């Protein structure tokens, strides 16, 4: 007997922004979550297709183009089941709390609640068990809805391969250098004179928040080894922006407490799977990590859309033994797909499967 799943109606806040656009694109083809309410600030009452600058592949879906932009008001969303919030830092926090108080499940790509102790910072393959924090959140805050956050795109590009390694090996450090695309700064983004013919350092503040998020994610990975303790692991990041459109490229030097073979780590990364793959969630790639063997791959232009769910796999390559206790690898993440909208949709699918969002 085939069980029919009801269609879940989604509201996308900031629907004309770069991440909002990816939510629209991906949900327009989703088997059971559909865009039903497109919220915006400056274009209320206007058709979506007339006001959006479609900064992604394809075109505005025909069934979406004539939908009106509506106010960001929970009282107008009686028939909405899920809120996706890629709102900017500062603006997002109070809006998301308002929706949770009104009983809505909120999936947030914003940093405003990422370090609230009762709010999951969810990477579904690494820490799916943390969704149980929702129960504590509801009890503590006395609301029927909830907020779940997804990490910074940069943090995910490192945390997914590092989490797979940290789970099975005595990793005691990682030193990360990032080369990040322009879309990570939103639209219209960075002035051209700042970034063309330049590499733009993002500064100590961005470095620090990247590391802080990676530490939280690693602290929640269920490990098969007992040491070293996380407090004995050294992490450092140096982050930069360059003039590519999509795709964050990261170089990681990973050190270990004992001799560790690069070939063994490579096999671990190739075989890494998580609960989304076991559950066959619609947006879960069959391989969350794709390992490339060519010495000149991954490349941003060719590989940011890699995988059977395009843009949802982290692509790893150039894996090399540096010394007996250190390896080097590079990772590539599509920052607005896996690193933002796609990660949010995957989180929602897990929450549906686990009963936190009504099927």
UniProtKB/Swiss-Prot annotation:
pH dependence of function: Optimum pH is 7.2, with half-maximal activities at pH 6 and 8.
Annotated cofactor note: Divalent metal cations such as Mg(2+) and Mn(2+) ions at 5 mM.
Subunit: Homodimer and possibly a tetramer.
Protein name per its UniProtKB record: Malonyl-CoA reductase
Regulation: Activated by dithioerythritol (5 mM) and inhibited by the thiol-blocking agent iodoacetamide (0.1 mM).
Entry function: Catalyzes the reduction of malonyl-CoA to malonate semialdehyde, a key step in the 3-hydroxypropanoate and the 3-hydroxypropanoate/4-hydroxybutyrate cycles. Can also use succinyl-CoA and succinate semialdehyde as substrates but at a lower rate than malonyl-CoA.
CDD domains assigned: ASADH_C_MCR, ASADH_MCR_N
Any further remark recorded for this protein: This enzyme contains bound RNA, but the physiological role is not known.
Thermal dependence of activity, per record: Optimum temperature is 85 degrees Celsius.
A molecular function GO annotation: aspartate-semialdehyde dehydrogenase activity
Residues of the active site: 153 (acyl-thioester intermediate), 248 (proton acceptor)
SMART domains: Semialdhyde_dh
Enzyme type, top EC level: oxidoreductase
Organism: Sulfurisphaera tokodaii (strain DSM 16993 / JCM 10545 / NBRC 100140 / 7) (Sulfolobus tokodaii)
BP terms from Gene Ontology: methionine biosynthetic process; threonine biosynthetic process
Membership in a protein family: Belongs to the aspartate-semialdehyde dehydrogenase family.
Pfam families: Semialdhyde_dh, Semialdhyde_dhC
Protein residues bound to NADP(+): 16-19, 183-184, 335-336
EC number in record: 1.2.1.75
Source superkingdom: Archaea
Catalytic reaction(s) noted: 3-oxopropanoate + NADP(+) + CoA = malonyl-CoA + NADPH + H(+)
NCBIfam families the UniProt entry points to: asd_EA, PRK08664.1
């Amino acid at each position: 007997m085939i069980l029919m799943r009801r269609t879940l109606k989604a509201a996308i806040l900031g629907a004309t922004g770069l991440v909002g656009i990816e939510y629209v694109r991906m949900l327009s083809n989703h088997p059971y979550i559909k865009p039903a309410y497109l919220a915006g600030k400056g274009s209320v009452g206007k058709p979506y297709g007339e006001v959006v600058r479609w900064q992604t592949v394809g075109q505005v879906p025909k069934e979406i183009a004539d939908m009106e932009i509506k106010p960001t008001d929970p009282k107008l969303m009686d028939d909405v089941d899920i809120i996706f919030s890629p709102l900017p830092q500062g603006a997002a926090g109070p809006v998301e709390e308002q929706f949770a108080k009104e009983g809505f499940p909120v999936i947030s790509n914003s940093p405003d609640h990422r370090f609230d102790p009762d709010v999951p910072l969810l990477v579904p393959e690494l820490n799916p068990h943390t969704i149980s924090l929702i129960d504590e959140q509801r009890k503590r805050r006395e609301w029927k809805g909830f907020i779940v956050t997804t990490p910074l795109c940069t943090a995910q590009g490192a945390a997914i391969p590092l989490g797979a390694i940290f789970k099975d090996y005595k990793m005691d450090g990682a030193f990360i250098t990032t080369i990040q695309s322009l879309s990570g700064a939103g639209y219209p983004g960075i002035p051209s004179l700042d970034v063309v013919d330049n590499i733009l350092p993002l500064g100590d503040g961005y470095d620090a928040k990247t590391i802080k998020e990676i530490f939280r994610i690693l602290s929640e990975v269920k490990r098969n080894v007992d040491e070293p303790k996380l407090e004995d692991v050294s992490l450092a990041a140096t982050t930069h922006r360059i003039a590519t459109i999509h795709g964050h490229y990261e170089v990681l030097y990973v050190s270990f407490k004992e001799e560790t073979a690069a070939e063994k780590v490579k096999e671990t990364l190739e075989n890494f799977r998580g609960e989304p793959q076991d559950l066959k969630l619609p947006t879960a790639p069959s391989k969350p990590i794709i390992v490339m063997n060519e010495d000149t791959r991954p490349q941003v232009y060719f590989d940011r859309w890699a995988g059977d769910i395009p843009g949802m796999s982290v692509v790893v390559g150039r894996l090399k033994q540096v010394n007996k206790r250190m390896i080097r690898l590079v990772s590539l993440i599509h920052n607005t797909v896996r690193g933002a909208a796609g990660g949010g949709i995957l989180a929602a699918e897990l929450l549906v499967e686990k009963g936190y969002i009504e099927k």
